[in-house]
């Protein structure tokens, strides 16, 4: 049993300590693949109720912790959760995803947005994180998370999930000043929100810029990277020792640029070999990832082989084992259990297969 004075395994990895195995957790480890989650969803069909009611969100956050004992427990929430606190309302429709109506398309709408006051608008976040810290103790690190400005802007401007990002790219290339104003406001709000999560108990922050991989490297440097960097800089001013993870879906073409944001860890998807990713990122950055979530549909022997291969390639320092994206909803729960069990036993498995 870990004591409050002990340092969680995941935090030790972010400090570059030499460990006998990498810490392990999964993006979307609390979710639809778990029967316990589906049962709770039947009782509480509204996503916003599940994520904004303290008791329900804590229960969901802890479901995978009780079942699999990952080294990280992430807040059950959504990257859009802080948007109403600045004046952008949203809903999440089952099978359709987020809906923002009306979408943000004019300068007048941007000018109406107001600074975020998390304690007034988002007190449930503090309550959830404080409760998770008490429940988890230091048996695992508690992670908070935020959406990056580009991805939040994409949802707000498109009004929904989409494939081609027509409206935000139209704004970027036809009215860049207006988009920069919006991105700046989002960055300020997100930095305040991240600090609030840390002050409430989050020991690590992961920033998701899910749609930045849709940008060319040139446009990433113009519309995404500066605002990621602004968020990190603002948070590091007050919380310099809190590890910061950056995840971009489809980041293979952007890897060398991601450390420029000032983050401590880059979360890599499966579109790049993790040994190559480490080489491209340099020695001063920890890496997280990067197993294809589809691997969890394979046989347990196949899953084990991919875990071993990934850990060997990533090296024995500064690596957090994770998927390259979130757990897919059809994933067999027993395979997730096997993944965690194997990851925890990896030091003996590596010795046997050396």
UniProtKB/Swiss-Prot annotation:
Which E.C. number(s) belong to this protein?
Answer: 4.1.1.37
State the protein's name.
Uroporphyrinogen decarboxylase
Q: What species was this sequence derived from?
A: Trichodesmium erythraeum (strain IMS101)
Q: Where does substrate bind?
A: 28-32, 78, 155, 210, 325
Primary role: Catalyzes the decarboxylation of four acetate groups of uroporphyrinogen-III to yield coproporphyrinogen-III.
Pathway info:
Porphyrin-containing compound metabolism; protoporphyrin-IX biosynthesis; coproporphyrinogen-III from 5-aminolevulinate: step 4/4
- The record's principal subcellular location, in a coarse class, is cytoplasm
Question: Which Pfam family would be a valid example here?
Answer: URO-D
Catalytic activity from the UniProt record:
uroporphyrinogen III + 4 H(+) = coproporphyrinogen III + 4 CO2
What family is this protein classified in? Belongs to the uroporphyrinogen decarboxylase family.
Subunit structure and binding partners = Homodimer.
User: Could you tell me which PANTHER family the record lists for this protein?
Assistant: METHYLTETRAHYDROFOLATE:HOMOCYSTEINE METHYLTRANSFERASE RELATED, UROPORPHYRINOGEN DECARBOXYLASE
> PROSITE patterns under this entry?
UROD_1 (PS00906)
Q: A Gene Ontology MF term for this entry?
A: uroporphyrinogen decarboxylase activity
In which compartments does the protein localize? Answer: Cytoplasm
| Marked site positions, Transition state stabilizer | 78
HAMAP family to which the protein is assigned, alphabetical: URO_D
Which keywords annotate this record?
Cytoplasm, Decarboxylase, Lyase, Porphyrin biosynthesis
- Cellular component terms, GO, for this chain's entry? cytoplasm
| GO terms for biological process, alphabetical | protoporphyrinogen IX biosynthetic process
């Amino acid at each position: 049993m870990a004591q409050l004075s002990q340092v969680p395994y995941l935090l030790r990895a972010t400090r570059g300590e030499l460990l006998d195995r990498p810490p392990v957790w999964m993006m979307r480890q609390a979710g639809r693949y778990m029967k316990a989650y589906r049962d709770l969803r039947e009782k509480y069909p509204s996503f916003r109720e599940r994520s904004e009611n303290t008791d329900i969100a804590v229960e969901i956050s802890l479901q995978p912790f009780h079942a699999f004992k990952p080294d990280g427990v992430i807040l059950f929430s959504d990257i859009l959760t802080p948007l109403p606190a600045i004046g952008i309302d949203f809903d999440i429709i089952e099978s359709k995803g987020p809906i923002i109506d009306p979408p943000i398309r004019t300068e007048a709408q941007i000018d109406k947005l107001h600074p975020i006051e998390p304690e007034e608008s988002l007190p449930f976040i503090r309550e959830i994180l404080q409760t998770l810290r008490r429940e988890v103790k230091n048996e695992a690190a508690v992670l908070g998370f935020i959406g990056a400005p580009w991805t939040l802007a994409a949802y707000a401007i498109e009004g929904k999930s989409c494939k081609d990002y027509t409206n935000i790219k139209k704004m970027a290339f036809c009215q860049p000043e207006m988009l920069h104003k919006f991105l700046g406001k989002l960055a300020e709000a997100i930095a305040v929100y991240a600090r609030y999560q840390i002050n409430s108990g989050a020991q690590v922050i992961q920033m998701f810029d899910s749609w930045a991989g849709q940008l060319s490297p040139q446009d990433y440097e113009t519309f995404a990277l500066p605002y990621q960097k602004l968020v990190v800089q603002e948070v590091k001013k007050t919380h310099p020792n809190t590890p910061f993870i950056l995840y971009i879906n489809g980041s293979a073409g952007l890897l060398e640029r991601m450390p420029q944001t000032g983050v401590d860890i880059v979360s890599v998807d499966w579109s790049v070999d993790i040994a190559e990713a480490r080489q491209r990122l340099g020695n001063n950055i920890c890496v997280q990832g990067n197993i294809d979530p589809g691997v969890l549909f394979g046989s347990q022997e196949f899953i084990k082989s991919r875990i071993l291969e990934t850990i060997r390639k990533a090296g024995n320092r500064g690596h957090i084992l994770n998927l390259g994206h979130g757990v897919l909803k059809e994933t067999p729960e027993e395979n997730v259990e096997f993944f965690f069990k194997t990851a925890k036993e990896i030091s003996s498995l590596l010795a046997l297969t050396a």
